[in-house]
Amino acid sequence: MGCAQSAEERAAAARSRLIERNLKEDGIQAAKDIKLLLLGAGESGKSTIVKQMKIIHESGFTAEDFKQYRPVVYSNTIQSLVAILRAMPTLSIQYSNNERESDAKMVFDVCQRMHDTEPFSEELLAAMKRLWQDAGVQECFSRSNEYQLNDSAKYFLDDLDRLGAKDYQPTEQDILRTRVKTTGIVEVHFSFKNLNFKLFDVGGQRSERKKWIHCFEDVTAIIFCVAMSEYDQVLHEDETTNRMQESLKLFDSICNNKWFTDTSIILFLNKKDLFEEKIRKSPLTICFPEYTGGQEYGEAAAYIQAQFEAKNKSTSKEIYCHMTCATDTNNIQFVFDAVTDVIIANNLRGCGLY
């Protein structure tokens, strides 16, 4: 009887060990499948992060991608110039030379006829170059926080000769700088450090937000993007709400959302290069009237970080913050490496394997 019982006990113990081993293997496998949700207000750099993942973790852009982005570069460039020209009368800025009026008319005509995605004609290229060199246009550009303008405007308009060449082909950096509004959900899959990543980018504009929250309650982590440089700008959607205040509000609603109680949150304070330039001449008090610090990058950036971290109401949830420049591949590679290490540690801890 004793022998029979010990045989049963041994069999039960063996079964128990097998179940535990299977559970552990399942846990390890589950810990290898990483779902990341990329969130943030419109134009915070989410789509650029997705493009960087293609460059860093996939085989980069295809020949077809380069071909498809060529008209986008043309359109982004001419539409940026149009945005500046349209703002001039609103800001009571004159051209330094009256002849620029006819150049501006040519640029407006091209956009009106919806030819903005086509290569620049020689006449159009010459007109755009004259306009961009005009002192009045440059003055209006320097006040771009007072109207809506793509971040990449200067990047493209400073390089009109290259973009206007007959044999122009976009570079990787050109593609990273392009702006196309994201609608719906963009999904990217890649492997890194023996993990299988699924990255979801969701349209940032207000009208899109209600579509995603409940669908992603099982994500491993949220990467929340904030454009640091937008502290002195207002929204496209209503032109009265400060963009950074809107970002803070959205971060609050995500960070403390019931669906994401146990979800790691990684905060990308993005566009640090533009912020570093801007903070010298545009005070942070535009967004945070109570700020008493200096007009200096380190102090101002730390203050912005503290405002976002203060929104976290959970004592058990940590916010992992990084200052980023989404158009800088080396910077994003370095930051994503650090992010992955945090995810690995958290995931293994969650499975009881760390």
UniProtKB/Swiss-Prot annotation:
Report residue spans for region: G3 motif. Answer: 197-206
Where does the G-alpha domain start and stop, copy by copy? Answer: 32-354
User: Tissue range of expression?
Assistant: Expressed primarily in neuronal cell bodies in the brain, optic lobe, and thoracic and abdominal ganglia. Also expressed in antenna, oocytes and ovarian nurse cells.
Q: How does it assemble?
A: G proteins are composed of 3 units; alpha, beta and gamma. The alpha chain contains the guanine nucleotide binding site.
Residues bearing a lipid moiety (N-myristoyl glycine)? 2
An example Pfam family from this entry, by short name, is: G-alpha
Could you tell me which residues belong to the region G1 motif? 35-48
Protein's name in the database: G protein alpha o subunit
Q: Name one GO biological process term.
A: establishment of imaginal disc-derived wing hair orientation
Chain residue ranges for the region called G4 motif: 266-273
Q: Which GO terms describe its cellular component?
A: cytoplasm; heterotrimeric G-protein complex; plasma membrane
The molecular function terms of the Gene Ontology recorded here are: G protein-coupled receptor binding; G-protein beta/gamma-subunit complex binding; GTP binding; GTPase activity; metal ion binding
Query: From which residue to which does any coiled coil extend?
Result: none
Q: What does this protein do?
A: Guanine nucleotide-binding proteins (G proteins) are involved as modulators or transducers in various transmembrane signaling systems. Plays a role in glial cell differentiation during embryogenesis; loco, Galphai and the G-protein coupled receptor, moody, are required in the surface glia to achieve effective insulation of the nerve cord.
Which positions does UniProt annotate for GTP binding? 40-47, 176-182, 201-205, 270-273, 326
User: What UniProt keywords apply to this chain's record, in alphabetical order?
Assistant: GTP-binding, Lipoprotein, Magnesium, Metal-binding, Myristate, Nucleotide-binding, Palmitate, Transducer
Give the lipid-moiety residues, type S-palmitoyl cysteine: 3
* Region called G5 motif, residue ranges: 324-329
Positions of region (G2 motif): 174-182
